[in-house]
């Protein structure tokens, strides 16, 4: 987050999220907030964890296998971010690169 000295009354939040897919996975969050204004509300947060086994169990009880369940949860996590990209060309390019349907 960058807040110029003229950007008073700015409200900003930076969030880093990650899914840890195996025992060797690591997630290093490094928030970067450059704030040059006095009257602002800016903060940051970080969250990480493995896939929810209850969610995998639920999807498997609905007919998906373990791999399909895991893939569906990961794609949902990725789509949450990708869908916020406003440029259609860039959004579709990223979807194509990570194998998500348009």
Can you say where each PLM-predicted feature lies in the sequence?
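Active-site gating/interface segments in enzymes
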Residues: 1-102
């Amino acid at each position: 987050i960058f807040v110029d000295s003229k950007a008073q009354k700015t409200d900003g939040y930076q969030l880093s999220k990650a899914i840890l897919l195996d025992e060797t996975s690591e997630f290093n969050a490094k928030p970067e907030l450059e704030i040059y204004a006095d009257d602002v509300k800016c903060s940051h947060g970080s969250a990480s964890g493995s896939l929810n086994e209850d969610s995998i169990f639920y999807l498997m009880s609905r007919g998906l296998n373990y791999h399909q369940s895991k893939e569906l949860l990961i794609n949902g996590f990725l789509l949450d971010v990708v869908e916020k990209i406003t440029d259609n060309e860039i959004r579709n390019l990223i979807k194509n690169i990570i194998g998500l349907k348009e």
